[in-house]
């Protein structure tokens, strides 16, 4: 499973890197985090978390600095979080999280992306109840039992720890993600491949052939929207 999360980050970075979409999306997220609190990551836990995630996605330092500098200025641009749930082919389910300065534009764009690519946007709550929100931490290692004990000793609410092919994946309660990261740092982990809040499907579906091709086009259309920050789904091995 750890390889899955690392592959998702690598795939997204490779796909978006050429057009700098991933940079722009992190730029907005960093700006919002800095604007809502102190523009200093040492004094703003949320900002530090976003910056760490940006670095994992290979976002350049100048992009991070520019977003923080923008937040320090007099701009009054505001962004609103949104969530759009829907369905793809053959039992696939999708959750789209957005961050936008124009809610009407974003809602229309997401609905169009669903409708023109074999999907169907549903009502709020139509899909999310079949997903669980968890903290996901991925780093190099192979001793899951030791990591589990370290997290318990640090009073971290940990759901599971998996080891696979030299990679450790930790699942925490969403409220304990930051606490888990700090506990691992305190125990010598210096570099993380993934530190994310994720929506984990309670069960997965397998798509093949035309269904898989349609689903891939649908996900690409959703992720290509500038206002879309995260896309979650229940399709296995994708």
From Swiss-Prot:
Coiled coil: none annotated. Signal peptide: none annotated. It comes from the Bacteria. GO terms for cellular component: cytosol. One of its GO terms (molecular function) is DNA binding. It is found in: Cytoplasm. InterPro entries: Integrase-like_N, TACO1_YebC-like_2nd/3rd_dom, TACO1_YebC_N, Transcrip_reg_TACO1-like, Transcrip_reg_TACO1-like_dom3, Transcrip_reg_TACO1_YeeN, YebC-like. One of its GO terms (biological process) is regulation of DNA-templated transcription. Keywords: Cytoplasm, DNA-binding, Transcription, Transcription regulation. Belongs to the TACO1 family. YeeN subfamily. HAMAP family: Transcrip_reg_TACO1, Transcrip_reg_TACO1_YeeN. PANTHER family: TRANSLATIONAL ACTIVATOR OF CYTOCHROME C OXIDASE 1 (PTHR12532:SF0). This is Probable transcriptional regulatory protein SpyM51586.
